[in-house]
């Protein structure tokens, strides 16, 4: 449906797999993610991404490589945080990039959330968005993602502008995007990740709504 509507890429995510596990997930999740991702890869001709919650970046990279996906969305790639799943005490960049090279998956791009949603960031409170983006760039990400505090929350316009000015990496807006905000966001950001706004009543846990999908496509064309 999304590919037919004209979307540039799609992202597979175990969003309904509540409550999320922190960093390490079981073989049943890896297996299900592989089957689902491969089915999407086979069904569309646009790039396919994958995120395995919460912060299971090694597993996501493995699945993306095996299933033929193109990129992964990561949490905790650089810097620590305290999230609803627990403490993300160690940044993942060093081990993850070495693992990517080891399995021959250098073609898989890494999109990194700069500040994990549903998390406290007191550990990095003395760092600006520009600092975090610069550090994430230095750590080896291929793109950075700016979000609001929770799923469906709009990202701060100031944060997006600061991120875009801080690094040559593509800046993606990763939450709270809707048909009204989309044109303005695309004047600053390289792209957006749209989830809740595509669903019935704007709720992430509902089914896709063809009318909402059409409004997003129209907003992008008008922007």
Residue ranges and their predicted role:
Residues 9, 130-147, 153-170, 186:
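Internal alpha/beta core interface subdomains
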Residues 10-12, 48-52, 72-74, 108-114, ...:
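Hydrophobic faces of well-ordered beta-strands that scaffold small-molecule active sites
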Residues 58, 63-143:
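Conserved anion-binding
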Residues 2, 10, 72, 136, ...:
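Conserved, mostly hydrophobic/aromatic
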Residues 50, 55-68, 132, 163-166, ...:
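Catalytic cores of alpha/beta
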Residues 6-32, 79-86, 141-157, 201-203:
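Glycine-rich, proline-tolerant flexible connector loops at the mouths of alpha/beta enzymes
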Residues 21-50, 90-112, 155-178, 211-223:
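Alpha-helix-loop-beta-strand connector modules within alpha/beta enzyme cores
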Residues 15-17, 51-57, 77-79, 113-119, ...:
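Active-site beta-loop-alpha junctions enriched in small/polar residues
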């Amino acid at each position: 449906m999304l590919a037919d509507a004209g979307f540039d890429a799609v992202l597979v995510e175990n969003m309904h797999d509540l409550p999320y596990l922190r960093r390490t997930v079981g073989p049943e999740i890896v297996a299900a993610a592989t089957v689902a991702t491969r089915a999407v890869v086979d069904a569309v001709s646009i790039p396919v991404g994958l995120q395995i919650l919460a912060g299971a970046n090694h597993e996501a990279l493995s699945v993306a490589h095996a299933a033929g996906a193109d990129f992964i969305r990561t949490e905790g790639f650089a810097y620590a945080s305290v999230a609803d799943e627990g403490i993300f005490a160690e940044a993942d960049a060093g081990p993850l990039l070495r693992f990517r090279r080891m399995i021959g998956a250098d073609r898989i791009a890494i999109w990194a959330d700069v500040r994990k949603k549903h998390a406290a960031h007191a550990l990095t409170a003395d760092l600006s968005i520009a600092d975090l983006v610069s550090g994430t760039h230095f750590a080896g990400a291929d793109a950075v993602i700016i979000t609001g505090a929770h799923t469906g929350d709009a990202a701060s316009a100031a944060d997006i502008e600061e991120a875009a000015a801080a690094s040559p990496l593509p800046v993606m807006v990763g939450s709270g995007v809707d048909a009204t905000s989309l044109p303005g966001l695309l004047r600053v950001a390289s792209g957006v990740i749209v989830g809740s706004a595509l669903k019935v009543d704007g709720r992430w846990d509902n089914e896709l709504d063809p009318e909402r999908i059409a409004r997003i496509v129209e907003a992008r064309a008008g922007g």
